[in-house]
Amino acid sequence: MSDRYPVLEGAEPFYFEGSRVGILVSHGFTGSTQSMRPLGEAYAEEGYTVCGPRLKGHGTHYEDMEQSTYQDWIASIEEGFQWLKERCDTIFVTGLSMGGTLTLYMAEKYPEIRGIVLINAAIEIPAMEPVLQLEGTRFLDAIGSDIKKTGVTELAYEKTPVKSVKEILTFMKDVKKDLPKVSCPALIFVSDEDHVVPPDNSQTIYGLISSEIKEIQDLKESYHVATLDNDQKTIIEETLKFIKRIL
């Protein structure tokens, strides 16, 4: 971490030591661990060991994010995975938005992952594609805080680096191509109304992964950041049920 970009309050990584079953929790693009902390705390209360890494360039300043690549974001998640592997025999991975993309990447690369839980996971965002043609523009408007529940704000950047959008577009394409490699059990949450990631991403993921055990659950009362929205309790309860079924 550079001193020039201190970590924002609430955006710190979180770690909870518990049982030999671990849960890796990933936040999304331009967001922070704040969006996943309620889930991490709930899983820790159930006795699980939980790790919520802060993705490189996130939870600081958008100019810091501009310097990071999707390989950096993968490295952040893999560090968390290693932390859990030192403490756990069984690991589940869950992620929101690009955190879901990272979750899919991990399941493609590490077949030992016991199960995954995706929340509005991203593999193609057509609205972002024109950014590939942009030259000379560094920052776009914010994409964070797409939440239906009143009075709730996501701790996310007020601007989106163009360079970072190009990174996520490349990353999503790579992950989509390898989706058939995902064979572990998968629980897929999708908001009916999402202003960031088109809900049909979840249907595509469901269709392309090779998992025998897979299910989609609709979230009717939440927008994109469902982990901070009206369906937060549903996500937590259904995830815990899913994990207990798989173990």
Predicted feature locations:
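Conserved alpha/beta-hydrolase "acid-adjacent" motif
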Residues: 195-201
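Catalytic nucleophile-loop/oxyanion-hole region of alpha/beta-hydrolase
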Residues: 61-87
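Short beta-strand/loop motif that positions the catalytic acidic residue
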Residues: 182, 188-190, 194
